[in-house]
Amino acid sequence: MSDHDSGNARRGRASFGAFVRKPVERGAPAGAAAEQGGLDAVQALPDDAVEVGAVVDAYGLKGWVKVATHADAGRGGDALLSARRWWLEKGTQRFSARIVQSKTHGDTVVAQPAGVGDRDAALALRGFRVFVRREDFPALAADEFYWVDLIGLDVVNEQSATLGKVVGMIDNGAHSIMRVEYPSVGKDGRPAAAERLIPFVGVYVKTVDQAARRIVVDWEADY
């Protein structure tokens, strides 16, 4: 069993929906991007939009942008490569952009949004966060999962004891680990949240039922 940023989780370092954002430059003043053609202003992002990266620079002279992906390019970056439409957001500015071409470039993804015709127009997009719709993610094999789809699932053991809810994922380089949060009591006697870490590997994870929003594990509550 494996989970994915996009591709095998053992290769990726960050996740869609559970990532550490990379720092990005502030970029052009607010409103500069809106002055260029080719981008459609929108009031809101799609309901299934997932943040997958941020525009960090222009690429070349012909309107291409360079995106630092929240998951490794070619792995988590696969969603950027497969989606033909991106959504961009910075502050109160939101745009929909049709992507003409995209490809990996080192550890980034570079792309040509329609209507962004030169380097200055591309530079105006620095600092915009990039989203794609979950439905545009590449399909995975039956035993593979995107981290964003695991966040929020309930975790129970084989004796039906409730262990908590997945609130995040960690990649330790060898495999992924679920951060499972559950209610507890703090040192002051007040209700508090506690966390247990469960490796997301086949020896412990028995079933993942996304429809039922439940993960069954071979794990005891007192581990």
Swiss-Prot record:
Query: How does the record comment on the protein's domains?
Result: The PRC barrel domain binds ribosomal protein uS19.
Name the gene behind this protein.
rimM
Protein name, please? Ribosome maturation factor RimM
Please give the subunit comment from the record. Binds ribosomal protein uS19.
Q: For the PRC barrel domain, which residue ranges apply? A: 142-223
Could you tell me which InterPro entries the record lists for this protein?
PRC_barrel-like_sf (IPR011033), PRC_RimM (IPR056792), RimM (IPR011961), RimM_N (IPR002676), RimM_N_sf (IPR036976), Transl_B-barrel_sf (IPR009000)
Q: What is its main location?
A: cytoplasm
Keywords, comma-separated and alphabetical:
Chaperone, Cytoplasm, Ribosome biogenesis, rRNA processing
What is the protein's species of origin? Burkholderia multivorans (strain ATCC 17616 / 249)
Q: Its GO CC terms? A: cytoplasm; ribosome
The family this protein is said to belong to: Belongs to the RimM family.
Any idea which GO molecular function terms this record carries?
ribosome binding
Q: Name one GO biological process term.
A: ribosomal small subunit biogenesis
UniProt signal peptide: none
Location(s) in or outside the cell: Cytoplasm
Its annotated function is as follows: An accessory protein needed during the final step in the assembly of 30S ribosomal subunit, possibly for assembly of the head region. Essential for efficient processing of 16S rRNA. May be needed both before and after RbfA during the maturation of 16S rRNA. It has affinity for free ribosomal 30S subunits but not for 70S ribosomes.
